[in-house]
Structures are given as structure tokens and as C-alpha cells.
Amino acid sequence: RFGNKIFIRGLIEITNRCRNNCYYCGIRKENRNIVRYELAQEEILSCCHEGYRLGFRTFVLQGGEAPAVKDEGMVETVAAIRQSFPDCAITLSLGEKSREAYERFFLAGANRYLLRHETCNEGHYHRLHPAEMSLSHRLRCLDWLKEIGYQVGTGIMVGSPYQTVDHLVEDILFIERFQPEMIGMGPFLPHHDTPFASFPPGDMELTLKLLSIFRLMHPAALIPATTALATLAPDGRERGILAGANVVMPNLSPSHQRAKYSLYDNKASAGAEAAEGLLKLEEQLKGIGYEVSRERGDYENGELTVDN
């Protein structure tokens, strides 16, 4: 469908502050052992300028879930990026928000939103998240995003604690019904400062099989080869691409902050995972017969469009 094109997205991890306490995540609210940070608007724009110079035409702003009082600042940041880079796509991955906040981000210039549901089985969801978090609200957020007009991404964590094959089948069927433009998935990786520290990581082969299933079921979807794959195995990203992924997201975040955005242990953020390593990434992809595309790669009307 895409020939040998792999789309690149510049990832900017804007904050590791989070109001949630998900049992699997290293930036959960109750983790007192990490230094919290939040990028100022000027720092985010600086990352975008560097990314644009390197050839990125999509920026992904990802961060822990912030309280509603921060929404106004995000609206201003999105508007500033849109004004400075009118030819670029802006993707947000900021968790669950009010419908009004999603609408304001969209009107300010955001095009895409990533919100992985992680699992659509109610019982399993409650084994991964504290009682105050709600699967039904998360799924409602996905519906809002679609109704507003975003290109929407959702997805799963493979091999999370207590996950069964039946849960994965439910996820496959949910994603088939929802028809997202983007499908994000990666293996569960434990973090030492979480309740799931002693659980084993998700299985690489199962992750790759699921990636291939999603590619066959959703031929036009944008599916990233995730950092988690590259963390699990040195050739994880290449194997993800060979299994059907068509997006990679090198890290544009300020290098001195990257280690603090520690969702799981030993997270890959250097070498080809970093934006500075774009040449290395291009070499690695060339080695398996693929090339980096600097096009935006928008998904419109059920088709992927690759011209700017």
C-alpha cells in the first residue's frame, strides 16, 4: 500500500507531570522518585524549529495528563505552532480531556489525537488502573475526538499484567468497529517504581503478530514501530516495520529532559530513536529495504494521502 515509505513524526515530550496513577506507568502521580518537568512554550517551539530543519512535517506533543487549568496554555501553544508551521500536522497525545478542551485544541490547529485505550475489557481495565479511572469515559473521549474531526489514534499495550488472549480478541474487534486512522501498540515494559515492577515484559513475537493482524485488517492505517519495541530488542523497530508498521517517531525533546520521561525502564531515546540520529535511522531502514518519507502522510476519507 505504501511501497517502501516510512513516515517520520517528531516526538516532543512536553511534560512528565500526570494526575493519574496507572499501575504500569513510570510517570504516575504517586512516583516520588522522578524529577518532574514541564516545557515552556518557547522550548516546544524551539523543538519544532529544529525538527522542521531536519525535515519533520508532523509534530507529536505528548505528555502526562494535566488538570484543566493547563488547557488554555496548550491552546496557545498549538496556535503558535500552527502559525509558525502552517504546512505541518500537529498531533496531540495528552490523555483524557473535556469535549470543550478537545474542540479548542482542534480550532487552534491540532489535526490528530492519540489516545490508546490500552484494553477495552472492563475487568482488565480495572486491574491496570485505580478505581477513579473509567474505561467508559476513555472510550467516550475517543468518540468525541472522532466527532470533532480529528484523525484519531487508539491502541493497546501487549502483554500487560492479567491480559488474556480473549482480551486481545476484544481489542481487535473494538478497533475494527472504531476504525481509527492510527493504531498504536507496543509491548508492556515494567518500571521499577510502579506496582507492576516485578511483572515480565510483553512478548515481542505476540506484539509483531498483532501488528501484522492490524495491518491486514486496516491497510490504510498509520501504525508506528514504537520506542517500546526498540527498547525490548535492538532490532525491534526494524522488525516492527517488516511486520507492517509504517511510522517512526524519533525524539525531538530537549536531550537533557529525555531521561525524565520514563514510562518504563531502559527506554530507548538515543541513537536512531533520537531526532539527531535521523541519518542512522535512514541507514537502518535502507538496510531492510525502506526509506524515510518526509511527507505529512495524512489519512483522509479512508485513504492515506502522501502529498504535502
Where are these regions (language model features)?
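Flexible, acidic/Gly-rich N-terminal and inter-domain linker regions that tether
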Residues: 1-21, 291, 295-308
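Canonical Radical SAM [4Fe-4S] cluster-binding loop centered on the CxxxCxxC motif
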Residues: 7-43
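Glycine-rich, proline-tolerant flexible connector loops at the mouths of alpha/beta enzymes
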Residues: 9-12, 32, 60-71, 123, ...
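Conserved, mostly hydrophobic/aromatic
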Residues: 22, 61, 115, 145, ...
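Core AdoMet radical
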Residues: 29-44, 51-72, 77-142, 151-158, ...
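Auxiliary Fe-S-binding modules of radical SAM enzymes
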Residues: 52, 176-308
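Alpha-helix-loop-beta-strand connector modules within alpha/beta enzyme cores
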Residues: 69-94, 132-153, 178, 198-221, ...
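Catalytic cores of alpha/beta
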Residues: 98-107, 161-175, 230-243
